[in-house]
Amino acid sequence: MVQSKAKAGFQAGVKDYRLTYYTPDYTPKDTDLLACFRVTPQPGVPPEEAGAAVAAESSTGTWTTVWTDGLTDLDRYKGRCYDIEPVPNEDNQYFCFVAYPLDLFEEGSVTNILTSIVGNVFGFKALRALRLEDIRFPVALLKTFQGPPHGITVERDKLNKYGRPLLGCTIKPKLGLSAKNYGRAVYECLRGGLDFTKDDENINSQPFMRWRDRFLFVQEAIEKSQAETNEIKGHYLNVTAGTLEEMMKRAEFAKEIKTPIIMHDYLTGGFTANTTLARWCRDNGVLLHIHRAMHAVIDRQKNHGIHFRVLAKCLRMSGGDHLHSGTVVGKLEGERGITMGFVDLMREDYVEEDRARGIFFTQDWASMPGVMPVASGGIHVWHMPALVEIFGDDSCLQFGGGTLGHPWGNAPGATANRVALEACIQARNEGRSLAREGNEVIREAARWSPELAAACELWKEIKFEFEAMDTL
């Protein structure tokens, strides 16, 4: 019966996507996954056809009518382009809003969501360029994800550190140190006043420093610095590996030696590996630091790719306790409004639509734990007031060269950063404006801290003043 009905209603051929997938009268449901694409059609392609093509090719459609369309309920499963807006101050660019039914996606799988929405349509010839700007994940879908292994509140309880940002450092040079010298640098930084040190993203298990040797020397440094400072310390041990089995072996060894936190490169490692590791971290009480290596390949271009706010949302669902988020004031890309938009999406429970900050949809995270943003890249002591004022307490401020580049060595570099941070927190708590008085706060603290004074003198002229590309 179904077969004869399908035969009777089937008309072979090619028809415009907009006839089926452009539905301006559609009202999105609470259970729909909503996506905003920045679409640049090829000359002569109407925006309605381009938006409908995106909806079709990222859901149920293909380039021609197929007989098996009659064997399913297309209206139930198809994506719908329900709204189109011209992009302000841009020629032939449009924000196309697409609603996807919940049943199109596997529960608890970021991999499946991204494969569906961006896996194929970005190579579509009718489009000159395409960028995924934002996604609204429905609560019904979010509840199928674990999210971060622990979250900000649990991390602070584990570390017994409250009322200020956490302070970190990436060990440099990133490649070439032996395991013992690497551990020595970790010890000096932690003893000097930092909360964390970090493997760089490309430190895995190279011939000059195998992972097991690094883990052991670093853990010795952590325990020695903790005994001397009476503070809980940690080092982000990068467990990223060539296979999932090897990654989990490294994670198990890190737990065995009682390290408090491990690290993963989530984009190069992949979302399946990241979700697996995040679930293991919750089960085993280990914090998870996430590096975004490779993100700029995906998100740097304004009209093509995936915006980092989408990658950050996906990471929160996949799982991670920390995520690098740019600095606004350092050497890496990041305009303040846009950056703080996705920082809020990482750590807040409910975020309202705010186009000025690039947030296209209101997002309810349904009590999913938050991710702590990590500001890292080209920052030093003179940036401290701005970083505290911009990111607030629930953040990790990470100084690599800004610690290890101190003229007196690693421990004095760490001390300089800790003094600068404590001075900024005290000034803020006393009601002073860090935006207006930040430099004076640092100068006052430098009068009684020779380590900070030396750092201030060294980096007083260093600035990274380039226009951000990531703007609305």
From Swiss-Prot:
Q: Which residues bind substrate?
A: 120, 170, 174, 292, 324, 376
Query: Which GO terms label this protein's molecular function in UniProt?
Result: magnesium ion binding; monooxygenase activity; ribulose-bisphosphate carboxylase activity
According to its UniProt record, which cofactors does this protein need? Mg(2+)
Entry binding sites for Mg(2+) = 198, 200-201
The keyword Oxidoreductase is annotated on this UniProt entry: yes
Manner of cofactor binding, per the entry note:
Binds 1 Mg(2+) ion per subunit.
Subunit and partners: Heterohexadecamer of 8 large chains and 8 small chains.
Task: State the protein's name.
Answer: Ribulose bisphosphate carboxylase large chain
Give the source species. Answer: Gloeothece citriformis (strain PCC 7424)
Chain's gene name: cbbL
